[in-house]
Amino acid sequence: MSKKALLILHGKQADNQSVRNAVIDWRNQGHELAVRVTWEGGDAERYVREALDNGFKTIIAGGGDGSVRDITQALMENGNSELELAIIPLGTANDFATAAEVSEEPADALSLLNRPAQPCDVIRVNNHYFLNMATGGFGTEVTTQTSEELKKMLGGAAYLLTGLTRFSEIESAKGHFKGEDFEWEGDFLALGLGNGRQAGGGQRLCPDALVNDGLFDVAILPADMDLLAGVKELFDSEARQDPDQEGLFVRTRLSEMKIETPTPMNLNLDGEPIQNTTFQIQAIRNALRLYLPEGCPLLG
């Protein structure tokens, strides 16, 4: 059956020949595929609105986790749970797509449109939305302060290098976390709220998260000075594959949670930083329909 879709392509990928070839091949199969290229902030959201006004129900995010977040935000603001999202991973880390096992080959990623789209959750933080993960504390500083030049040269390893060079500057944050049958208060070094499983270039903060369970996974790394050595171990290759090997994290799984902090805290939503002293988090079940590969580990 012919598909009608809009590909919103990150401006840095405008000359990507693999993407161009995949688009041409897809069109030659009889599908209608329009392409828009972003130039500045706000373009992705504007293109989504224009697409929906013109009868498109399927949007393809051609970019990294930030592009996926921008498009997810625009789709959620529309309020239609029948809208469909596909991903062509073209960013530095591609954390959500990597955990979902979406191919980085544009033609293969585009071919997922031949499969049924799966109902998936989106997480709301105050009036913002994200698909993959929100991070706070030290992990947020690493992600937001890693230079674009370093990311271009080293890919996901850039986040690791930034974390190691800033290790002596680690400062904890203080917060009060409350949800159904869960309450925790104290100083923490890192926080992950996961619909997906990893962030910051492969750090698996929420290794068991699912995108279709109506919940988000919570991972809190307490600021216990005796565990600082364990924090450093999170940045070596072995520990990065199993961050719970030392039992460092406080973990739970919730549909709603409130975070309160005595001073403004930065929370990074798939690359988009927001700042507040109160965060109301909610999992919105079956908010969007995603094109994911067969056997996707993020589906329960």
From Swiss-Prot:
Cofactor note: Binds 1 Mg(2+) ion per subunit. Ca(2+) may be able to substitute.
Residues that hold ATP according to the record: 38, 64-70, 92
Gene3D superfamilies, per database record: 2.60.200.40, Probable inorganic polyphosphate/atp-NAD kinase, domain 1 (3.40.50.10330)
Functional note: Probably phosphorylates lipids; the in vivo substrate is unknown.
GO biological process: phospholipid biosynthetic process
Protein's name according to its UniProt entry: Probable lipid kinase YegS-like
Residues the record marks as active site: 272 (proton acceptor)
Signal peptide range: none
Keyword rRNA processing: no
Source species taxonomy: Bacteria, Pseudomonadati, Pseudomonadota, Gammaproteobacteria, Oceanospirillales
Gene source species: Alcanivorax borkumensis (strain ATCC 700651 / DSM 11573 / NCIMB 13689 / SK2)
Domain (DAGKc): residue spans on this chain: 1-129
